Amino acid sequence: MSEHNQDLRFLISDDVLNEDPMSTGRFAEEDRGSSDTEQLTDNKNDGEEPKETAVQAAFDGSDDVNRLEEPHNPVSSTANIGNFALLESSSAEVSDASCPATMPILVRQSPKTCSQPRTRKVKLSTLSLSSDPDPDINDPEFKARLEDSNQDDQDEELDLEMEEADSAGRESGEGNRDSEDEGLLADADLPIEVLLRRYGYPVPEGEGAVNGEPEQSESKGREQAAPTSTVSETLPSTKLSLAQPANQTDQSLTDTALPEPRVPEQLIISGKRQRRKKEIWTPDDSEPQHLVGKKRIKKVEIVEKVEADVHQNGDGLVIVEEETMGDEDNDDSKVGQEEEDGHEYDSEEEYDEDEDEEEEGAKEDNVDWDDRQDKEGDIGPRVRQPFLLRGTLRPYQQAGLEWLASLWSNNMNGILADEMGLGKTIQTIALLGHLACDKGVWGQHLIIVPTSVILNWEMEFKKFLPGMKVLTYYGNQKERKEKRVGWHTENTWQVCITSYQIVLADQHIFRRKNWCYMILDEAHNIKNFRSQRWQTLLGFKAQRRLLLTGTPLQNNLMELWSLLYFLMPGGIGADATAVVGFANHKEFMEWFSNPMDKAIETGDAMDEETLETVAKLHTLLRPFILRRLKSEVETQLPGKFEHVVYCRLSKRQRFLYDEFMSRASTHEALTTGGYLGVMNTLMQLRKVCNHPDLFEMRPVKTSFAMDNVARDFEPSDILIRKRLLAEEDERRIDALAIGFGVAHNEAMSGWVARARQTYDASDKLPYAASPLRRGKLSAPPPKDTRSVELWLKYRVWAEEEFSKRRWESIRATNRQRCGISPIYGSTFLSLLGNLPNFLLPQDVQSRREETFADFTPPAAKFITSLPERAKSLEDVIDRFAVIPPNAVARNLATYALPGLEPISHPALTDPAFDTLHRSSVKLQIAFPDASLLQYDCGKLQKLFEMLRDLKSEGHRVLIFTQMTRVLDILEMFLSHNGHRYLRLDGSTKIEDRQVLTERFNSDSRIFVFIASSRSGGVGINLTGADTVFFYDSDWNPSMDRQCMDRAHRIGQTREVHIYRFVSSHTVEENMLRKAEQKRLLDKMVIQEGGFNNDWWGRVGWKDMFGDVPGITDVSGVVEKSGEGIIDIQVEGTPVAEDVEVTRPRAGEERELARALAEVEDEEDAQAARMAQGEGELDLQEFEEGPKAVAKRVRVFEPENSGTPVTTEAGETGDVVEEYDDEPGSVEEYMLKWVEEDWDYFSPYRA
């Protein structure tokens, strides 16, 4: 064997160069496809040789194993040159001194990038010529993914068959002619020039032998080289694309010379390479090296080594040839190099053209990850879902995870800008789980979020990734100090969640740590690069940075520049994009911001230069921003369908609507009232459309109370007193004392009653029969006390009269008692109660009467009490006794007998005594019928019909409204129809919102959830419902969009139908048209790079309705009937929320704010203020310094709120001007508006 054979060395995988210096001395070789992976220990003196080796070569017959290790040096060790890495061979790599110590080695770079530094074992073996040939040369390329659970056993059987075949060949003396070792041994003695010409590569000029000895070519090792770290500067290189002519190819090394695979079709695994016994190399550790039906592609670049950081003692080059696969994705540099060289492969060795086109298309638009995943479905996802993650990611979320993992692998930062509701939080959590499970990177990570969603993030971590230790860093200074106990202890926590305010307050603490990942939620608020917050966060030490936002593109592109510079403070080098000097603020403004802002503000159509600028901007942003809309993933999310429901006004609504419009005050307000008058009119008309009770309540009718007419006549007192005092004897008789009761004498027998009447002796009493006297009655003696005789005479007469009246009273009482008789009598009732005794057979012994005492007598049911009679007539009273008299007067006896006091005996004040109270009250007060609540409103009539059908079909409903009083009416409506519901309004506490939403989502018995559109959107997820009703539209369309997203978001499994109620032929129909016009106008404004088209020059406000595609003129549909359901087109892109060109000027804003504050109800204004307060609580974290105090009271419409917050004049001492005096001419009108807006524009005059 020649000396060159002994000096032949093999290039070890580039993973050695990416080893962590802290992990020196620890080796591990992972093989996830097999359970019996071989491992080598650190003990170099261990004499035990592993059964199988990862890399085998034939040298001098020795079986020594060289285990090499090299620390990580991403700058000085490697350099990216297209698809190759230039490595420096040193004595640490190859211990044999016969090989040049400074021999540069050119290595082809694998498609994947090293994602995480790891310490790996490297095994180098030398075998004699008589050693066993490598059986891996016969491994087939797997075509399909194995789904059988016995995959390992089948692979083991296949390996055994291949080894037996090789052993049989060696015993026969033939050996394995296709072995890599055989080919290497045959080419070992040839010079490098001969090898290059033999395999079809041109020899570079001036390059020949190295140090007088020919260079050696490395064998096609079974360990595929891993990618190396990129360098910060591009190395100047001489790039030669070397093709392989067909006539010079060694046919013994082509795939056609390989034997037919012996593996059954069902055992083929796509994307994996079967190694040897119990060894399967998975895609996570190495790239597959063979494809069934694919030709091996040999491509070598020869590049001069000029890197200053790499120590170089010679000019030699070692060319390493590696195999690539047609099915695997190549990196961007490879595709670009092939396109630049213009190389075309021969028919036998070129890629499949269709697959190349798909790969290049995916690289040109890396945003469409779903399509790319579909094309790569044969090889499966490149990043597996972390095993610690609970639940299953959706396909587009899996694509987002792969994109985030690729950012980590490529040492890049990025912006995840998915639309709200697509799960940016869960994708971020999955990324951290992937780093922990697959990369061994457990943190520590820093997540900065708004204050209102800190607990939401913590709940999401506990729900989906409970294996992570999460620290929620918030509270006062003392609480935060307690939470910092063990701050620097390893594995105390892996993720720290805090807010923007706290991270600034404790920046000296956060700045000391070296964070693994720094993630900013709602990062679109960090857009002012001059702010202290932006500069503070920029100074934090973090390996990677990730921004989460739903609106990455704001009003101007300079805000986007702030985000991109935050990700890449050092600018973008030539290895990432063609734009050099990106970090230059001035140049970026000149290149992109100024042309785009000019095109948008002027409304002119974009010229070719501007469109080219937009294309360059898109090219710049694609590698760093991932943006998916719901319309793009609608195949994975349930569909969303919007409908407009036109409702007819009821008779009462139409009467009130027409009556209000015909008022003179209404005409005056519309003509001379300004904004305040117009807004007041609109609000009143909207109240009529929502429900007439909001405009005018149905009255509760009562009788007219008046004094009694008889009181005005003086003789009435005398006549009443004479009538009441006429029968003195009867008046003094107590009815109860004499037994004058209807039902009090039923215990008396009829025999006793008749006996009393027979033996009545009332006429036998004294003075019973008074003798008739003729003539005049003698006058009573005078009461004269002047003489004894006259006094005694008067006294005798008085005693006689008293005795006479006493006997008359006794006689009348006795006659009354003897004359009473029962209605039925005890004899009759006893006869009825004992009636069953007569029906008994003669041979049955008669039972005691006490036995039947427990039974109700049959006649008792005919005798009902007053409460029972009142209850039986309750339905009649409720239905018909509803008309009170027109007028009532007080009782005359109250005025006739002023000295009498009302009776207040406890027995009379008992509610059971007054059985006719309900009927008497209804005769006095007439309440509106409960059913009129529904029949007075056309919207409620339509809602009743739709809810009835939806409930029968098993749907669940959300009802949103702007007005709080409408929620009260909806509560009465739902209670009247028997629907179970929950209510959420602006007065609901933030901590109670989560409880209500979870109860609704978990309890399917709750049919309806009614909520105010201003109840706040933080933490509200109502995916339990699949139908959304907008009873009325909010002033701010963004509030309605948030309400839609509460049901149509992650977790929704059914299609969502959205119904918007509109009263036909009213002001609501015009408001809907204006909303559609604004939606289409906003759709044309900076949406996902849509700076295209010349709509800006030809679309106007009038043309947008009817002429613009997407708007249907529904006026003719509801012209005759006045009702119906119209389907509208769901917008494919979200409406821009912050657009300067659509915002009104300051004067209009102030007028609108004042008008809404005046005309809205106090409950609605309070709900709006609370919702605005929640928004301001988050926005305060992004405000920089105190605002300048204006000289006048400024009133602005806040973002995402229907009602603006008005400033009271008393707070600042200013006086808000009134607009009672209207200008008399156009000039005065213009001057008035200019004077009002002068203070607003004064800061911009300079």
Swiss-Prot record:
Per UniProt, subcellular location reads as: Nucleus
Q: Where is the composition biased (Polar residues)?
A: 226-255
**Keyword NADP found:** no
Any one GO MF term held by the record is:
helicase activity
Q: Where is the composition biased (Basic and acidic residues)?
A: 27-52, 167-178, 363-381
Could you say which residues bind ATP here?
418-425
Q: How does it assemble?
A: Component of the SWR1 chromatin-remodeling complex.
The protein in question is named: Helicase SWR1
**Species this protein is from:** Cryptococcus neoformans var. neoformans serotype D (strain B-3501A)
